[in-house]
Amino acid sequence: MTTPHSPKTIDELMSRANDMAGLTLGQLADSHGFITPANLKRDKGWVGQLIEHELGALAGSRPEPDFLHLGIELKTIPVDKNGKPIETTYVTVAPLIDIQGLTWETSVVCHKLQTVLWIPIQGDRDIPVSQRQIGSPILWRPNEEELALLKQDWEEIMEFIALGQVKQLTARHGEVLQLRPKGANSRSVTQSIGPNGSTQMTNPRGFYLKIPFTQSILSRAFGIYTQATSR
């Protein structure tokens, strides 16, 4: 099994990501001696782990950007035949206790989304996992409007948590960012702030980017790319 080194510069990272574009997951897996699963029902994190390995990501599941020394978070994003994201994008686990003094600027969500390297990957279920193609990379930094929307949603969600109302939050809350249960199963529980400042047990929660938001990122990036190459 090969172990690629972590890129020292953004240019090196992007060069490696561009070299990967056009390959299938099976081809990439074979190059590292990985076994490609027949489906992803029991291996939901396999694609992300494969791409992380190829690009030399270091963070793993730690609450920091994947390429901390470059300030870049890596996100694989499955898309359908029309280029639309198939699912929401997980960002990080949500803090449910000890949140006094926490601000958007000091939050893990803010840090992880400062600069994101998006890797689109064919996600249609009728395409065998080994034959799904890796798309062109997108290096994205949120603009002022996107940052404002993210901050607004994060602050509203954290207010619910601080008031002990985490159980009232649904995936419908938030324009671009949502809070959803995050755990291996519904039996996973953790502490959270309860009514009147008490402590209660609840399912772990995670922050996710909504599909229309990630769709706008992809559309804008590939729209610019198309214009640039059609001159």
From Swiss-Prot:
SUPFAM superfamilies: Restriction endonuclease-like
Superkingdom as given in the UniProt entry: Bacteria
Chief place where the protein resides: cytoplasm
Record's keyword terms, sorted: Cytoplasm, DNA damage, DNA repair, Endonuclease, Hydrolase, Nuclease
InterPro entries (alphabetical): DNA_mismatch_repair_MutH (IPR004230), DNA_rep_MutH/RE_typeII_Sau3AI (IPR011337), DNA_rep_MutH/T2_RE_sf (IPR037057), Restrct_endonuc-II-like (IPR011335)
MF term (GO), any: endonuclease activity
Keyword Hydrolase annotated: yes
The protein's role, per its UniProt record: Sequence-specific endonuclease that cleaves unmethylated GATC sequences. It is involved in DNA mismatch repair.
Identification of the protein by name: DNA mismatch repair protein MutH
Protein source organism: Shewanella woodyi (strain ATCC 51908 / MS32)
Gene from which the chain derives: mutH
